[in-house]
Structure formats: C-alpha cells, structure tokens
Amino acid sequence: MPINLASPGIVVKEVDLTVGRVDPTSGTVGGLVGPFTKGPVELPTVIANENDLLNTFGKPNSIDKQYETWLVASSFLAYGGALRVVRADDDNLYNGAVNTSGVSTTAAALKIKSVEHYEQLGYDDNTISNITVAARNPGSWSNGIRIGIIDGKADQCLGVSSIPATTSDWVGYGVTQAISATLPGVGSTTLLDGYLKGIITGVSTTGYSAAGDKYTTVQEGTLEIKVISHVSAGNTETPVEYQPNGVYRFTTGTATTTGHNGIQVMTNAGATVTSLGSTVHSSEDWFDKQVLYTSSGNPGVASTISTIQWSSIVDRPTTTEFATDRGAKNDELHVVIIDGEGKVSGNAGTILERHTGLSKAKDAEFSAGSPSYWRKYLKNNSSYIFGGGAPIGITTSGFSSGWTKQTDQAWDQDADGIIFGSSGTKNYKIVNGEDYKRNLNADGTVGVITTGGLTASVSKLATGYKLFENADNYAVDFLLMGSANHVKTEAQSLANQVIAVADIRKDALAFISPYRGAFLTDTSVGSVTVNSDETITNNVVGFYSPLTSSSYAVFDSGYKYMFDRFDNAFRYVPLNGDLAGLCVRTDITNFPWFSPAGTARGAILNAVKLTYNPSKSQRDLLYTNRINPVIFSPGSGIILFGDKTGLGRSSAFDRINVRRLFLYLENAISAAAKDQLFEFNDEITRTNFVNIVEPFLRDVQAKRGITDYVVICDETNNTAAVIDNNEFVADIFIKPARSINFIGLTFVATRTGVAFEEVIGNV
C-alpha cells in the first residue's frame, strides 16, 4: 500500500472485504391498470391496503361494472401484498375547475393527470391560463367541492345613503376623515390631529338603513374601505394599520377636517367628489361580515346555501412577515376547501382542508425551503386542488403616491415593494369534471357514448401497462389483468398486452382471467345468468387458445362471487388478483419455490362461491390447455387446483414454482453481480463471485428449492476473447425442485401365505 508521505506521518486507510453478497428478494408487489373514479392518471401509485385504495382512487362503482377492477385490486391486497395502481387515461377525462371569472370552466379546457403532469405542463412556475382553481386530478369526483378564498380587501364597511349610479366609479378613490384623539404613551400622551386616509375597494347597492339595525337593498349602499395612512396637520403621511377598536378607523358622525366635512371621497387627482357627512349611517368591521359557503346551492338564493363566518375559522388576513420585510403589503390570503355535497366525506359542509397564512408573492416562504406562495403551497399540501392564478376583478388596495392608484398590483410575482391587489371573499364551486365516456352494453359491447362512463378502452389500458415495461423504473413482481368485462377479442388483446410486458421485463408474472361473457349473461335490467358448465368450459378453452405461450403468464379458470361492502351487494369478480395474491402469501409463509396451489397454500379469500366449479373431466381439459382450475373442495373450501404457467410446451418452466424459483435466483444473483462491474476479470474476481453465489444456492437447497447446483466461473468460460471484450461470464446450473401434480396410489391384495418380497415390484 503506497503511503505517499514526504515527511514523517501516519496514513490511515480502510479496506472493506465484506462487500459482495447475495441478498434475498421478496416478491410481493403487484401492478394493475384500470378505470377509477379519482386519483392520478397514468402514474403508478403504491397502495399498501384497501384503505389506501379507497382514499386514493375512490370507491368501487357499479357503472360499467367498474367494481371488477377495484375488487381485483382489493382481493390482491388481502393476501398481504402491495400494489402499484395506474388509473387509465381517456380522451374525455377532464378536471373540474373554476375559471378566473368565478364560473365553472368547460371540461375540455383542462386536463392535469397528476402532480408530475402539472410540473411537465409548466404550471409549477407559470399560472394556468383563465383558471383560478382546478381539481387535483380528472373526474366528476370533484364536482360540488366548494373553495373559499379570502384576503384583506377591506377593513371596514360604511353604510351610506348615496352612491354613484355606476358603482365601479368610486373604486380606487380615496376617503378621508378628520381625527382628533389622544394616544397614550409611556408616562405621557400624544395629541393626534390631521386626518385618516383610506381607499375605496368596493361599492355595492346593499347596505344598512338609517336606523343602523336592519339590512336592506332599497336606496342604500355600502362602501368597502381599506385604511392606508394617517396624515398630520403638518401634512406628514405615516402608514398605519386598521384598528378595529382603536383610533385608526373610520367612524359615523360629522367630524371635520381642514376644508372638509365628515368623510370625504377623493378622486385620484386629489379633488373632492362629495362629503358624505351624516349620510354615513354605520361603520362595521369588513372581515366580521364575510361568510363562507359550506354547502352547494344557488348563490343567488340564500335559503339554498349554508354559511359560516370566516372570522370563526381563520384570523384576519393582513400582510405576511415575508412581505413586510420586503416592503410589500396585502399579500396574505386563506384558502378553505369544503365538501359541498358530501361526496368526499359523506357529510355536506365538512371542512376538508384549511390553508392559512398563504401569500400572493411568488417567492414567499414560511422558512427556507418551505414555500408559502399560495399556488406552490397548494401543489405541495392539498389533496384536492391546484391553484391556477388570481381571479379577475383584482381591486387596487393602495396608492403609489398621493391619491394615484397603485398599478403594479398583480398576484403571482415576487414580493419586493409590491402592494398586492385584493379580491376580497370568493366562494367557488368546482363543476364540469368529467369521467370516462365509453359506456358498455350489458353484453360487454361498446354502447352509446355518453357522459359518466367508467370503462377505459383497451388501447388506454395497454398504454398504462407499458409504464411497467422498464424494470428499472418500477419494481413489480406480478401484473394483474384486472377487470375482464370486455368482449372476447378485446379481452384477448388486453391479455396479450399484459403478457408482453411480463415477457419484456423477465422478472414478473402476468395473471390472466377469461372474459366475463364466458361465464355470465348480463341483461339490460341488471339480472345475471350463469352459463352451463359445458358452455363455460368451451368458452374458457377457446379464450386461452390463441394467447401467447409464455412461462411468465398464469391463466385461471374464472370468476368468484364475493361481497361488496361499499354497495351492500354481491359481485362476480375475476380471480387474477387472487392467484397473484396466493403467490404473495406463499412468499410470506414459505418461499417462492413452493407451489401456491393445493389445500395447504391455495385457499382463495373472500369467496362465497364460484361461477364455475369444473368436474374432473373438465379439469383435465383445462389443465392440458395451460389453464389452472379453481375449484370448491368440501372441507377445504375454494382452492387453486393447478400450478401451470402459460407455456405451451413441456418444460421445467411450465410450473409456477419453477418459474418463480428462477425469478428469485436471477433477481438476487444479478443484483450481486453488479458489484463485479468495472472490476478486473481475473482469478480473484471470479473466485470472489463464486464464493458469493455458492453459499446463497446452498441456503436455497437447504430450504428445498433446488436439489443440486454447480457454479462455473473460471478460465474455461472466461476465455481470453471474453476478457478482451470486457465481459464476465458465469454459468449456473440448477436442478429445480418439482411440485407434485399427480399422485398414484396402488392397493394390492395378496393371499395369506404369500411373502411380500415375492410380489413387490411385480405389480
């Protein structure tokens, strides 16, 4: 070891000779693609249990028998595995949204499949054109969700008897009122003179009567006022904040200031428009009057909408500390998300999320690395919506100088020196989210294209499964076909697509079920008739006959009958999720090289009965055609009674346990082989590799996975030509353990005087 010291010293080096071992792998992750009512689209999402499935992708639905997909996934999860679920796309699948005018957007205008898609579309850094809020992902699930947004548009509401004919004429004008008050200090008092300056941020035709205790809409008006500053008698202007019960607030009465009487309305050129004087009948806190709609209805009909006061759930929005430090104002806003129709939580009016203290400033943060910018915060933290951009009708809430309105007031820009415009209180309802539109007839054929369907086309399902083709992107051990509610040819096409993905990966098994029509005849009125066993046998054999021959596929014999607790009904569900689940359970209780079939390990969960319980002769026909029968066995229940793969020729790999043994060995040893990359192909490296692999194989042999093995990794297969090509070769010979499929029991009767030695071997 070179020390590389020019003067006396000590060099410490550490050598790790423990590197290199074969780590066992576990095959418990499935992959499934299907139509769901909600959730990210075309993004494999890890689901650990049924509750995760429910929260992420919604409940099973009877429309287009979508429950088949959902219950296949649920069945697999019941055996202890995890599932990467992909929600299939559709050309008519759209997000619900609200456009910037506060009206629902057309569904065709927007599709955001997932957070990743949101970022790919550039919305992480840019606003969404014409959209204020959008549902987190496509579908009608979001329709009826209410969104409340509030900022500090105003401080006070002044009830007045006179307003301009066009209410918008005064918005942005200034208001003043004389002040004569004493401010307490430390050991002294300060005389406050001059006038209070504010800006009109809203004018409406509703207000309070002269008595001040009755809300009316007759010849009355309301001015919404934002307090800006105090101007002293010496004309020194000082920014101030509104004080609900203090000095800095506008009051009723006829107090005077130099040249003015009562509250004055000033143009942006500084000219007096009018003196309101005694016509100001009331002065109320603006924030205390703001309401949040909590249930869906017609905003124009008060009796149809439930409300709560904003002040009961959030603090008054003002200016964030981040903005204050940068000379900005009025950036704070709150966002509340409410289940307006009870579709999400089950209770209309439930507050789903409350996001407070957010900022309109694009660079705003609560702390380093924790954005408070409203759009980025919602992207990172909301389960229901994305922020699109500021609503239209942003009102100026400050002056740039004197009485000149602030012009640089837009949301979604950096905070430095900006007086952000205000929108006040916004009550939105998300609508126009669209589901799949490809409805099916009772017999599985494509029906009339209408809204509200829950069937994805085979091409879209295939696109979803292609996401699993690259084994480096997503680790899956089982690919589930899911729903078989397709016509025969479409189901065969989908099955071949799933098998093709497994063949490409070489590390996963595809589990296939026959099409629904092979077993069941559905009617337009919802009744179901089970076909005869003879018809089913012919249908099942005919379905599998043209499917690709592959040892990476497993074929089952049908459907089970199970209870759907979400709809309080029994459903017919394909068995592909159960067969994959049996493999998971076998991994957990035994090892991958044990067969998942039989009474010991092949019990099907959550099954009341089968649509098809094949007889012995029918099982013979199925098994010779690569199909694994699932049967009812008295005393044992419903069990898997076969362990063949979909390989169409005689081979060790025509059995599930052998195929899974080799997948286990290949995955584990290939992972260990990565440590040999970029090493020298010499005797030391080769010996090290053999010493890594042999103990692993010896352990598998001790656990009954293989009967014998040999590892060849020396100069006989690593020739000079191999070495010169920068290659490394190891040949591993395996004698796999075989599962018992056929048992022969012979009972021989002999005469009393016959010795057994005379007849043993002769019968």
What residue spans do the PLM features occupy?
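Surface-exposed intrinsically disordered loops and tails
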Residues: 160, 182-183, 205-212, 231-239, ...
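Extended assembly-interface regions of large multimeric machines
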Residues: 1-229, 234, 241-244, 258-336
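Extended N-terminal export/anchoring regions of large proteins
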Residues: 172, 284, 290-402
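Short amphipathic beta-strand/extended segments with alternating polar/hydrophobic composition
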Residues: 96-97, 109-115, 142-150, 196-200, ...
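Serine-centered coil/turn micro-motif
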Residues: 139, 235, 370, 492-493
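Short linear, low-complexity motifs centered on an aromatic residue
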Residues: 150-155, 348-357, 492-502
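Structured, hydrophobic secondary-structure cores that serve as assembly/anchoring elements
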Residues: 1-107, 117-118, 131-134, 330-334, ...
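Short, cationic low-complexity segments
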Residues: 153-158, 176-178, 358-367, 751-763
